[in-house]
A protein has these predicted regions:
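Short acidic/His-enriched helical or mixed secondary-structure segments at domain edges of catalytic enzymes
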Residues: 184-203, 282-301, 338-347, 358, ...
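M16/insulysin-pitrilysin zinc metalloprotease superfamily fold
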Residues: 21, 116-120, 150-182, 331, ...
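Non-catalytic, conformational "gating/processing" segments within enzyme and secreted inhibitor domains
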Residues: 201-202, 212, 229-265, 466-468
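M16/MPP (pitrilysin/insulinase) zinc-metallopeptidase core fold and M16-derived inactive scaffolds
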Residues: 89-154, 194, 215-218, 331-346, ...
Length: 507
């Protein structure tokens, strides 16, 4: 009954609503809106034309680590932070003056074997111990050394240091494990030799630096297959020495406790004579630009590698060279990529970097282009280097591109401060390159203080566009005529530096 009454009342109310509106008549017509001026519709993509302005400049205050030398010669670099985790790493310094020149890849293979068991935790027992700690080891080998790193909670500092010392000092080097690891390593290296860009850089560095310095860090398949467990043991006993190593610790720790634990776990690392240091190989003398060509029949693209030598990391003027190369080819907005990608549309990307090692440096440019644009791309790269370096060039470096490079380098340094493992990685440079403790703290200020005219002088002094090493992997029949038309001698490559035969499959 109540529902029917409510329904009736609602119907009556709705029926009465129209009577509330004012009645329309001829004397009271409906009011029309006043006309408005014509306005052109907004371009929905106009905002893309407005380049965003840079944000606030990042301030950088990179802390200076402490250095303690143990009696056995081990250097301890430590940096306390408020981070919730610890980053610990052992760095073994090695180079062509210690390692045998006729055994490329031996140092990397030795490092790979470190985590396959120790004398205290053989085989899978080491993996179980690491898993119990809730972490894992990372091992990385470069041209200057090997880094063995681990992350742990501050409460696990003692256990983490114990495992790190075991891996670095007491590897088991089981013959059974060696056979498996070497087979996997060779397969990975062979796979990398199927990558045109990897091949072009290997060929280029061999020609630029010679067999010793220029050999690939991970070795050649044929050479790796010749190595035995005895080679690994010999390499470890002559290179993994406390006087040739550093321990880096970054995170939340008590300095007194850390020193005591380091002495406990690393103090027994015996100091002994290592391998005699050989004379540093002389770099091949480059007198003119030359092209090395590896045939990859019917390849739709050419992998291009262009390089020439620069001073080593520890040589004076590192900040100038780093800023110069970053401005030239280190960014998407750098002139090299803007030319080859944005202007010419030859490639998806062309970049250059400064490879700065303990004994040498190199400007290395890498890109891949459509086969028909190979010679054009080489010509543009050489022209860009000429415009950068030649005196009275019509296209010298300008403030905008240098400022972008400055900001990128400084911001990347700032990013390091948020991660203990990145700070630890930065500390590696201090030991490997014999740099002062405040080097990282000063680097940002040095980058910011380099005047434009000084950077232009650096380009003229160090960039030599007439003595380039150019390595190309591509369809030789298609690209050879264009390369010869550039006026450079073209040398066919069929083998790598150790005699490794190169038979690239047709596409």
């Amino acid at each position: 009954m109540r529902a029917r009454i409510a329904t009736t009342l609602c119907a009556v109310a709705l029926a009465l609503l129209p009577s509330c509106a004012p009645a329309l008549s001829a004397k009271n017509p409906a009011q029309k809106p006043a006309p408005t001026a014509d306005v052109a519709p907004k371009d929905p993509a106009a905002w893309r034309l407005e380049i965003p302005t840079p944000g606030l400049k990042s301030s950088l205050s990179f802390p200076t680590p402490s250095l303690l030398m143990l009696e056995n010669g081990l250097r301890l670099y430590s940096l306390p932070t408020q981070a919730s985790t610890l980053s610990l790493s052992v760095v073994i310094r090695h180079d062509v003056q210690i390692l045998p020149n006729d055994k490329p890849g031996l140092a990397a293979l030795t490092a790979r074997m470190l985590t396959e068991g120790t004398t205290l935790h053989p085989d899978l027992k080491l993996a179980e111990a690491i898993e119990a700690l809730g972490t894992d080891f990372a091992v990385d080998t470069g041209r200057d050394g090997t880094t063995i790193s681990i992350e742990a909670l501050p409460a696990d500092l003692d256990t983490a240091l114990a495992l790190l010392a075991e891996v670095a000092i007491k590897p088991a080097f089981s013959p059974k494990m060696f056979d498996r690891v070497r087979a996997q390593w060779v397969d990975n290296v062979r796979e990398s030799l199927q990558d045109p860009r990897s091949l072009s850089s290997i060929i280029g560095f061999e020609a630029l630096l010679g067999k010793g310095l220029g050999a690939p860090v991970h070795g050649y398949p044929d050479a790796l297959l010749r190595y035995t467990v005895q080679d690994i043991v010999r390499c470890h006993s002559t290179v993994y020495l406390p006087g040739n190593a550093s321990l880096n610790v970054v995170g939340d720790f008590d300095p007194t406790k850390l020193t005591r634990l380091v002495q406990k776990h690393f103090g027994e690392w015996r100091k002994r004579a290592g391998a005699p240091r050989s004379i540093l190989p002389t770099l091949p003398a480059a007198t003119a630009t030359h092209v090395l060509l590896l045939d990859r029949p019917r390849s739709p693209q050419s992998a291009i590698f262009v390089a020439h030598t620069l001073p080593a990391r520890g040589a004076p003027g590192y900040a100038d060279r780093e800023l110069l190369v970053t401005a030239f080819g280190g960014l998407f907005t750098s002139r090299l990529n803007q030319n080859l990608r944005e202007s010419k549309a030859y490639t998806y990307g062309a970049f250059g970097n400064y490879l700065a090692t303990r004994h040498f440096g190199a400007l290395a440019i890498s890109t891949s282009v459509e086969t028909k644009f190979t010679a054009d791309a080489v010509r543009e790269i050489v022209q860009e280097l000429s415009d950068l370096a030649l005196p009275n060039t019509p296209r010298p470096l300008v403030s905008d591109e240098v400022d972008r490079a400055r900001a990128d380098i400084v911001h990347s340094l700032v990013e390091h401060l948020g991660h203990t493992n990145r700070i630890a990685a930065a500390l590696v440079q201090l030991f490997v390159h014999d740099l002062p403790l405040d080097q990282l703290a000063k680097l940002a200020a040095e980058i910011q203080a380099i005047p434009l005219d000084a950077l232009r002088r650096t380009a003229t002094e160090f960039i030599t566009p007439t003595t380039l090493t150019i390595a190309i992997v591509g369809d030789a029949a298609s690209i050879r005529p264009g390369l010869k038309a550039l006026g450079y001698p073209v040398e066919d490559v069929q083998k790598l530096g150790d005699g490794e035969s190169l038979q690239t499959p047709p596409m």
